[in-house]
Amino acid sequence: MRPYDFCGKENNESATKLKQGLVGKITGYGQSMTPILKSGQSVICEPVKDETKLEKKDIVLCKVKGHYYLHLIWAIRNDKEYLIGNNHGHPNGWVSRNQIYGKVVEKL
């Protein structure tokens, strides 16, 4: 299946499309994930479903404290809470699984 092109979309729209079950291409901007992801680099995200395995160091599209991030899972607590942060040592905060919309499965 060809991925839905989320590029240029607001992250809340991308999150909605992922919740609808669409695989999507997302472009991230900024320096917070370098060198793992460069500013302007696109990734393929798959929707996070009940059976999706989430692990430390996975890159996910999530919502933390009202903001959307394409950041790393730093830690997992009780198999249901996830500490999200960037690649430069800055944590964003803890989220529940339902605040994680997509998991990066390929860097383009």
Model-derived segments and spans:
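Extended hydrophobic leader/signal-anchor segments used for secretion and membrane insertion
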Residues: 1-108
